[in-house]
């Protein structure tokens, strides 16, 4: 009897993602295969799911889009791809998703969501105003013989 329940749950996993191809796609991209109810989709194409049978902290998740702001994100998924309005719901700061209760507009939130630029040439590097404790040695300049 328990074997039948495991097989039934496995078939639900495969059929819930659109067949074997969709199942493998989600498995390789997210390293986790879960089935839940679709709560909503943001303007970039990220899909947000919820399953209250899971324990707290793993009952809400996102399936990221394959392209965002002109960048191919199929294998390059980043947590900064979640817009602020969905971040509130995803991290359980609110029970109402933005599809039910839209958040209030804030002037510090961008209209077009940006990626995390850390580790790229566009990253923010603050100017250092303190003097170095150790200075680099500069060899005396002599002509090469």
UniProtKB/Swiss-Prot annotation:
Chief location: mitochondrion
Question: What are the entry keywords?
Answer: Acetylation, Electron transport, Membrane, Mitochondrion, Mitochondrion inner membrane, Respiratory chain, Transport
An example of a Gene Ontology cellular component annotation for this protein is: respiratory chain complex I
Q: Which domain of life is it from?
A: Eukaryota
The keyword Electron transport is annotated on this UniProt entry: yes
Kindly list the places in or outside the cell where this protein is found, as annotated in its UniProt entry.
Answer: Mitochondrion inner membrane
Modified-residue entries (N-acetylmethionine), positions? 1
Key word Disulfide bond present? no
Q: Which Pfam families has this protein been placed in?
A: NDUFA12
Described function: Accessory subunit of the mitochondrial membrane respiratory chain NADH dehydrogenase (Complex I), that is believed not to be involved in catalysis. Complex I functions in the transfer of electrons from NADH to the respiratory chain. The immediate electron acceptor for the enzyme is believed to be ubiquinone.
Q: Which family does it belong to?
A: Belongs to the complex I NDUFA12 subunit family.
Summarize subunit and interaction data from the UniProt record for this chain. Answer: Complex I is composed of 45 different subunits.
What protein name does the entry list?
Answer: NADH dehydrogenase [ubiquinone] 1 alpha subcomplex subunit 12
Q: Report the source organism.
A: Bos taurus (Bovine)
